[in-house]
Amino acid sequence: MSALPHFPLAAVVGADELKLALCLAAIDPAIGGVLIEGPRGMAKSTLARGVADLLDGGRFVTLPLGASEERIVGTLDLDAALGEGRAQFSPGVLAHAHGGVLYVDEVNLLPDHLVDLLLDVAASGVNLIERDGLSHSHPARFVLIGTMNPEEGELRPQLLDRFGLKVQLHGTPAPSERAEIVRRRLAFDADPQAFLIQWQGAQQALQQRCVDARQGLAAIALDDAALNEIAERCHAAGVDGLRADLVWLRAARAHAAWRGANAIEAQDIEAVEHFALAHRRRPAPAQSATPQQPSSRQAQAPSNASNGEGQWGELPAQNVTMGERRQLPGWPKKP
């Protein structure tokens, strides 16, 4: 049974920033994946599926809802290890996603340790399984795409920082764009093959551009001039750690390859700045309120304690009339 066709990325209306970020992650998966933040109905999953068609394998894997750690990383058959002297590995989601796209919907609702695991493998490109003294590893290079709706919860800052790029979708498209989006969706649903043929030229041009960019990526140097510029900007943005510098530099190189250039230029650094700093930039500290000056009436209050008022805010001493001292009768002496 053939897989259902994906809506071509070239036919998506608008969302230019998100399409660029996804293409950069497809060019260099070492960037660390893309986090898409936005409400429902913004074509996040459609765009993620479209990225898979830009990769060599074209594989698109969705993380099942409620998947356990063993389902994600795979399992080792200990009984086979004892009987045959070797570990038998059953592949998990990460093995199936190798060479393609791993899509995690509502990543902010996953347990933190699973998000951490996914980010570790996405960054290293290797999945290592260790159980009871046995270990197995396999390559797991994929483009990690996570989506989240901020109304349903946030990611911890430590996990948020580990996503390479972040794109925030907000606002509603113009009426003309809305109509065109619906028109293209209806055409695709009515006859997917005819729609794919209609957009075949634009889709193939986009695929070839990504292929050329991946092939030319290694020839573009991560030069000191670009690194120094990025380091200055990260410092000015108050970014914690060095992950932003590394991701920004890699994304700028991928953007240069996307343009077909041979070196990183200022326009490449500018083009990806928001993607790298959107979730890492620290807000400027709020200015402290100016201390209130005492009123003129308070300032003119006499401070001489001899006038009976003492310091401002203190009540003057009051003379309290005391009654006569009573003499208690003494105890009678013992006879």
Protein language model annotation of sequence segments:
Residues A26-L65:
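Walker A/P-loop
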Residues S68-E69, A95-A122, E154-L160, P175-R178:
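Conserved AAA+/SF3 P-loop NTPase catalytic/coupling segment centered on the Walker-B
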Residues V115, P173-A179, R185-R282:
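Basic, amphipathic alpha-helical bundle interface domains used for macromolecular binding and assembly
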Residues M1-K19, A237-G238:
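Dynamic helix-loop-helix/coil hinge segments at AAA+ ATPase domain boundaries and subdomain interfaces
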